[in-house]
């Protein structure tokens, strides 16, 4: 009950969004009942022997959980290039003629979540989305943890083939290790004045302007709760928001 109250306060008073998230690698990840084989449960039982129907059932089960717990959407953590390929995730472009299994998975999630005002985002390798499929996703989140300069970040995220990529792209800093220093300590910002400051990685991300002149869609941290013990609590997130909105306001149109 306390967690439900916290969630309600976060959503209704603070205006926050809480998304369900896990790595999507194999059919049934996180939701296959204990003791049951994923293929038997999702393909044979739920899909009546059809793998694609099993994918639809899996996506709908995720949506059922989101609705049950009053969450705001789903974050597809998609990392086939980082050791997480499987029966759903692979190196193919996600499209009807490429990785059609993920195509159907995303189509099903999008059709359930977005009309209801919920979000569907992809992090990890959103660059594997086809142009048409990217229209079904609200945000592309890149784990830009170890990029050491503004130019290397822009190189990583510059994907004009993705729908509205400038406004929909979010870049994140790694805080399991970098929570004390606002990210890596060997980062070089295109803004010289930031390079003399501690935390120049997260401050650069918060003020990052794309080649068109538009501001990056958003920023984040992996394990934001690690920023809480800093003084003041959430020191780096607060400072990043201040720099991005007040010190270097951006162009969003």
Stretches with model-predicted labels:
Residues 1-200, 214-216, 225, 229-232, ...:
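Chitinase-like catalytic core of GlcNAc-active glycosidases
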Residues 206, 212-220:
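Cysteine-clustered segments with highest specificity for TGF-beta superfamily mature ligands
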Residues 221-253:
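Extracellular low-complexity, O-glycosylation-prone Ser/Thr/Pro/Gly-rich "stalks"
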């Amino acid at each position: 009950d306390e967690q439900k109250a916290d969630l309600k306060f976060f959503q209704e008073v603070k205006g926050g969004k809480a998304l369900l998230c896990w790595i999507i690698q194999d059919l049934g990840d996180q939701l296959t009942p204990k003791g049951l084989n994923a293929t038997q449960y999702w393909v044979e039982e739920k899909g009546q022997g059809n793998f694609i129907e099993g994918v639809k059932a899996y996506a709908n089960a995720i949506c059922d959980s989101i609705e049950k717990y009053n969450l705001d959407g789903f974050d597809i953590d998609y990392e086939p290039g980082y050791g997480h390929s499987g029966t759903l995730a692979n190196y193919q472009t996600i499209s009807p003629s490429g990785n059609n299994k993920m195509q159907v998975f995303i189509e099903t999630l999008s059709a359930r979540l977005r009309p209801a005002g919920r979000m569907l985002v992809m992090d990890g390798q959103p660059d594997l989305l086809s142009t048409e499929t990217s229209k079904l996703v609200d945000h592309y989140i890149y784990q830009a943890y170890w990029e050491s300069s503004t130019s290397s970040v822009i190189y990583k995220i510059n994907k004009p083939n993705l729908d509205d990529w400038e406004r929909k792209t979010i870049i994140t800093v790694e805080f399991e290790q970098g929570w004390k220093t606002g990210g890596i300590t060997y980062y070089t910002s295109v803004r010289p004045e930031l390079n003399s400051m501690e935390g120049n990685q997260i401050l650069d991300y918060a003020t990052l302007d794309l080649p068109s002149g538009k501001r990056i869609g958003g920023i984040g941290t992996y394990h934001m709760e690690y920023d809480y013990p800093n003084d003041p609590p959430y020191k780096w997130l607060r400072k990043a928001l201040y720099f991005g909105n007040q010190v270097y306001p951006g162009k969003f149109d």
